[in-house]
Amino acid sequence: MTWFIDRRLNGKNKSAVNRQRFLRRYKAQIKQSISEAINKRSVTDIESGESVSIPTDDINEPMFHQGRGGLRNRVHPGNDHFVQNDRIERPQGGGGGGGGDQGQASADGEGKDEFVFQISKDEYLDLLFEDLALPNLKKNQHRQLNEFKTHRAGFTSNGVPANISVVRSLQNSLARRTAMTAGKRRELRALEEDLETISRSEPVQLLEEERLRKEIAELRAKIERVPFIDTFDLRYKNYEKRPEPSSQAVMFCLMDVSGSMDQATKDMAKRFYILLYLFLSRTYKNVDVVYIRHHTQAKEVDEHEFFYSQETGGTIVSSALKLMDEVVQARYDPAQWNIYAAQASDGDNWADDSPLCHELLAKKILPVVRYYSYIEITRRAHQTLWREYEHLQATFDNFAMQHIRDQEDIYPVFRELFHKQSSKSEA
């Protein structure tokens, strides 16, 4: 009786190759499903991955079949209704009118359930932040921010099926079989030579010839029992993450918490900043994040207070810009740091303060930052702050602004602001 023993280390993940191939083939549909799903749950809920649904029509495989219409000869085996040369009437309706009369709940229309499967946390985040990067990142420092890229690093004896090296594994198999059977093959050749000598000698030595044939058969059986391939032979392509030359970076998060920001607007702003935080922590190892909340006064806070504090008040946006400028001058030398900022507001500001915001950005902040993004979250018409910022966008290439009306706009706006651009790094 033959027993098969599965000694693979990844025996519980035997379909890994097919899974990776499926994710690559239907990446566009999966990313579309993820962009829709992210608006239906908290972006911090990532531990369980995501259930992704794909329309069944998108995963149909091509198939060959005979076209409708025309004349053709067919053989119907085993029928008891027709004999040779009988004519069979053509079915009515040329469009494949099958289906029967079952399912009378609806007079017309048909469909199929969508294909639903689960992706892991890592797969979810990889697809969520694919092709995103901090714009204009200057490669001039090597101390804090470590960005890693994957490189080939030889072969390893452990790995996943997707990384198996067939050529190297077969080479190892050949070397092992050669080493394990070399002595037996030498002995086999010697016995075959003895057998040939005895068979030609006179008189015929039947007993000796029989013994030699038996030993030869036993040796051949032993050689054939050496397995063609063993887990010892398997080699996998090895990859390692190497730090790439990169620079120190700091992200300023400026959030308006004034009384004009209702709870729904604040929640959308927080969702945007949570996305930003996940993106930075996923893509870069070390990035400083400075959190600033403002109403009539601005205050630098920690992460918990930034997201959960209930403090509110009037609206003077320039207070946050002044505080950011002070922090930059005190802690972040523009010659040593890549400085980024993301500002979220409903656009409601004291009218006389908006020109001051324009002046602060144009003269102090934009000349020293790599990228400044402004997100206005409102369903109302734009006010003076937006119009002042429009002048900045026309003048500065490192200033971007986007408008969020509903929760569904958050992820598309985020991707638009941080999509990966062509490399323009300065020396």
Curated annotation (Swiss-Prot):
Per its UniProt record, what InterPro entries does this chain match? UPF0229
UniProt lists compositionally biased (Gly residues) regions at: 92-102
Domain of life the protein comes from = Bacteria
Which residue ranges are recorded for the region named Disordered?
A: 72-109
Kindly list any coiled-coil regions of this protein: none
Q: Where is the composition biased (Basic and acidic residues)?
A: 77-90
In the record, the note on similarity to other proteins reads: Belongs to the UPF0229 family.
Protein name, per record: UPF0229 protein KPK_3252
Q: Give the classification, highest ranks.
A: Bacteria, Pseudomonadati, Pseudomonadota, Gammaproteobacteria, Enterobacterales
